[in-house]
């Protein structure tokens, strides 16, 4: 078993690269949080022809934990070089002693023997300022890769927690740059709660699901023009959407 301290390693969403399926293991404890004695990111490398686990690789240097996310398959992605990036939410901001979150990377080295994490490409965002705000992230909720090293994301700021981190409007829509290691607030999208943080691409827009204090629904962001608009108003919080023509 690849589980730590229980019977399930808690598989997240995976991705296929070449002949192998990369399956992150969230390794969650009974409180749906990482084990304090296993602050790392584990990934199984599985042969898609034989379904055999070829190796288990772990990123232990940065202590980024909870790789992938069971709610959003976009939390694991490949860039143009087929380097795999995996979002790590850590403690979802519930542990003030551990606000480490961000992304870990498995570069495209080609050969199975060379396949492993590169901790120099990991990014712990907890010390990165969110430009346009006075905050730094205490967790990351969701991501969508846009290309060119740019990532649309929802991150959280502890200072925005007033009463209840489940319902407080602590989620900030941001644009992250994997190369420059910067995080910028996207103006025009309200702060949201931790359960309305879905992101998806639709045509030339990035669509954010929002449950704001005054506005709720789907908000579109055009990364080319930098403009935002509310696309749909809802009564409750919006998370997923399906578009058809």
Predicted regions and their residues:
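Short, conserved, GDST-rich strand-edge loop motifs in beta-rich repeat architectures
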Residues: 22-40, 85-102, 153-169
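Long, acidic/polar, low-complexity amphipathic helices and coiled-coil-like
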Residues: 1-73
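Structural signature of eukaryotic scaffold interfaces centered on beta-propeller domains
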Residues: 6-18, 28, 69-84, 135-148, ...
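Entry beta-strands of beta-propeller and related beta-repeat scaffolds
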Residues: 20-23, 81-87, 149-153, 204-208
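Blade-level signature of beta-propeller repeat domains, shared across WD40, Kelch, NHL, RCC1
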Residues: 211, 222-245
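Beta-propeller blade signature
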Residues: 36-51, 98-112, 167-179, 221-222
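Loop/turn-rich, solvent-exposed surfaces of beta-rich toroidal or solenoidal domains
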Residues: 133-211
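Surface-exposed loop and turn segments in beta-propeller and other repeat-based domains
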Residues: 1-7, 53-72, 110-138, 185-193, ...
């Amino acid at each position: 078993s690849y589980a730590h301290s229980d019977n399930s390693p808690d598989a997240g969403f995976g991705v296929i690269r070449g002949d192998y399926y990369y399956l992150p293991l969230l390794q969650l404890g009974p409180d749906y949080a990482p084990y304090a004695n296993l602050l790392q990111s584990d990934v199984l490398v599985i042969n898609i022809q034989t379904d055999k686990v070829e190796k288990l690789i772990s990123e232990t240097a940065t202590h980024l934990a909870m790789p992938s996310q069971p709610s959003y398959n976009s939390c694991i992605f490949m860039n143009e070089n087929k380097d795999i990036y995996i979002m790590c939410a850590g403690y979802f901001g519930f542990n003030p002693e551990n606000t480490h979150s961000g992304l870990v990377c498995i570069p495209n080295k080609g050969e199975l023997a060379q396949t492993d994490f590169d901790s120099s490409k990991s990014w712990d965002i907890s010390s990165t300022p969110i430009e346009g705000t006075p905050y730094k992230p205490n967790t990351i909720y969701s991501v969508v890769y846009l290309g060119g090293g740019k990532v649309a994301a929802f991150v959280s700021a502890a200072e925005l927690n007033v009463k209840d981190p489940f319902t407080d409007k602590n989620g900030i829509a941001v644009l992250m740059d994997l190369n420059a290691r910067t995080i910028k607030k996207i103006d025009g999208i309200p702060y949201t709660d931790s359960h309305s943080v879905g992101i998806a691409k639709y045509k030339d827009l990035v669509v954010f699901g929002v449950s704001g204090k005054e506005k709720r629904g789907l908000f579109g962001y055009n990364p080319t023009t930098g403009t935002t608009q509310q696309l749909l108003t809802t009564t409750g919080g919006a998370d997923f959407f399906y578009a058809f023509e």
